[in-house]
Curated annotation (Swiss-Prot):
InterPro entries: D-ribose_pyranase, RbsD-like_sf, RbsD_FucU. GO terms for biological process: D-ribose catabolic process. This is D-ribose pyranase. Its main location: cytoplasm.
């Protein structure tokens, strides 16, 4: 049995297969996922698992050099923004319109759906390197 943090087989496979500058997205329960984008659905019920719980677990295994967030998170969910920034204090942040973030999901290796039910709790992680 795997000993590291992420034990979901689909998610673990995606993370292991990512190279430098590849994208992985994590989002709330309501985020629409484009056809053709792999969806790893972890949602069980409202807020379970939370966006933050999933993000923390993914970050334990994925090197991240840049993140993409919806511009709207600044005013519509500043608590979530602060929590994201606390987890990734030294990572470059690009803010884009929510409509653009939704379109960009088509470029990600996978979308991880959480049970999160707060607005604009969506992120695209750009993988870095460990050397």
């Amino acid at each position: 049995m795997k000993k590291t943090t992420v034990i979901n087989s689909e998610l673990s496979t995606v993370i292991a297969g990512m190279g430098h500058m590849d994208w992985l997205s994590i989002g709330d329960a309501g985020m629409p996922v484009p056809m053709g984008t792999q969806k790893i659905d972890l949602a069980l019920t409202k807020q379970l698992p939370s966006f933050q719980d999933v993000l923390k677990n993914v970050l334990s295994e994925l090197a991240v050099q840049k993140i993409y967030l919806a511009e709207e998170i600044k005013t519509q969910n500043p608590e979530q923004l602060a929590a994201i920034q606390a987890l990734l204090p030294d990572v470059e942040v690009a803010f884009v319109p929510h409509s653009q973030l939704k379109q960009d999901l088509a470029k990600t290796h996978a979308f991880v759906r959480t049970g999160e039910m707060t607005p604009f709790s969506n992120i695209i992680l750009e993988s870095g390197v460990t050397f």
